[in-house]
Amino acid sequence: MRVLFYYRGSEHIGVQSIMAYLKSKGHLVELIYEPALGDNGYIDIPFLNKFFYNEKLLVDKAVRFRPDLIAFSIITNLYMPIKKLARKFKQVLPDVPIICGGIHVTSLPEETIKQDCFDMLCLGEGEGAMEDLLQRMREKRSYNDVKNLWVKDASGHIHKNDKRPVIRPLESLPKP
């Protein structure tokens, strides 16, 4: 399966870990990473920021990759711009499910799942949940009961699944 990850800001070990895990399971993963220099408080020159953030280029890259799944990791200060970008992705790739995780999602799942641009949430560790999700997608089976996921079905019902045990030892995961 083809998974497109998006992250903005600084490097993110959680995203890198999930990507490494999925690669080790044979999935093709791609990262759209934006340094977002204007977000850090050191560089705030609106004229220059437009050169570092180009929504059309991001959307074009997503379309070229042809993902089966789009994944976002969200921290609260980036919730609004990520929601805007997810809506753009949903417009051009309407049949591609969008999943998001991260500290914002774990802290505010009820608010996040209400958004029309997000199809599912991952609460807690994503490695096993993402692998189970992709396996079910490949087999064209329902993934409404995958642990660690909240899944919004076609009728709008939200399936809030239990959490899975944490991964121990962490050294069992591939290195990012």
Residue ranges: model-predicted function:
Residues 2, 31-169:
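Glycine-rich beta-alpha loop elements in corrinoid/cobalamin-binding modules
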Residues 2-3, 24:
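N-terminal glutamine amidotransferase
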Residues 7, 19, 134-138:
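Short, amphipathic alpha-helical segments that act as regulatory/interfacial helices
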Residues 7-15, 74-79:
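A short, glycine/small-residue-rich beta-strand->loop->alpha-helix junction that serves as a flexible
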Residues 15-21:
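Short amphipathic alpha-helix
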Residues 174-176:
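Pyridoxal 5′-phosphate
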